[in-house]
Each structure stands twice: as C-alpha cells, then as structure tokens.
Amino acid sequence: MKVIFMQDVKGRGKLGQVKDVPNGYAQNYLIKQGLAKEANKGNLNTLKRVEANEKAEYEAQKAAAQEIKKQLEADETVVELKAKAGSDSRLFGSISSKKIIEGLDKQFGIKLDKHKLELREPIKVLGYTNVPVKLFKGVESKVRVHVTQEN
C-alpha cells in the first residue's frame, strides 16, 4: 500500500515522502497512529499544494533575507554605539549582541533575532568591528559596529 508520511518514521520514511509499505503495517500502525495517510488522489493533491506553499514561503523568507543583506552591506550602515572606556581604549563592560540588535533597530529599523549574530565574544574595545550575521540558509552578511567613547 502506498502511503504519505505525515511525520518522520525511523527506518521507514520522512515527512512528506510517498512510499510503498506492507498493507498490515500501514493500516494497523502508520495510519492508526497518525504517522501516515493513504496515498490516494486527494491526499496527493493536498501534499502537492502544501509543498508548493512551503516552497513559496521559503522563497519569500530568502528574498527578505537578501533585502536585509543589501541594507547591511550598504556603506552608510554602521551601528554607532557609545560606551565608557579607559585611557587604553578598553571598555568598562562590553557590547553584547543584544545592544547591537537594539542599535540596528533604532538607527536603521532593521529587526533581527540576536541569535543570528555570530559574535563569538562581546566587544571590549573602542573602534570598528565587523560582526558576522547568518540571515538565512546560504545568506550571510556582516554588520559594521563603531564603538565610541561616552563623555
């Protein structure tokens, strides 16, 4: 019997996959547990529609990420932050991902999740720093951060 997997089933199939499985296994386990549906015309058409919607959503998210990348890579996009520092240019404290994200939002209206920034450790010195950003699968950029001394 052909079934459409509604969830990943270890050793049998993955979500959205159409496979031939033994009739008893399909009827008595997969379908009863809600792990799969029978692969009839209606269910196959539904699967195609769902896949098309997911692909369109994926493309829309990727396009949005490309747009944000274009904004981040513009020359005028430099996040200006102020912090107290000593005479040796070392900060009293540090600049975290959260502060960079807040600066991006306030100064440029770019909203990002702080987990997209790949800041290995907080910024602890004055000056310019390039912070890598992973916007989407295969879409990466850098945010330029300029830390100046607070009076």
From Swiss-Prot:
Question: Per the record's keyword annotation, is rRNA-binding included, yes or no?
Answer: yes
Name one process (GO BP) from the record.
Answer: translation
Q: Which InterPro entries does the UniProt record give?
A: Ribosomal_bL9 (IPR000244), Ribosomal_bL9/RNase_H1_N (IPR009027), Ribosomal_bL9_bac/chp (IPR020594), Ribosomal_bL9_C (IPR020069), Ribosomal_bL9_C_sf (IPR036791), Ribosomal_bL9_N (IPR020070), Ribosomal_bL9_N_sf (IPR036935)
Task: Provide GO CC annotations from the record.
Answer: ribonucleoprotein complex; ribosome
Under the GO molecular function aspect, what terms does this record hold? rRNA binding; structural constituent of ribosome
Q: Which UniProt keywords apply?
A: Ribonucleoprotein, Ribosomal protein, RNA-binding, rRNA-binding
Q: Which family does it belong to?
A: Belongs to the bacterial ribosomal protein bL9 family.
What is the stated purpose of this protein?
Binds to the 23S rRNA.
The name on file for this protein is Large ribosomal subunit protein bL9
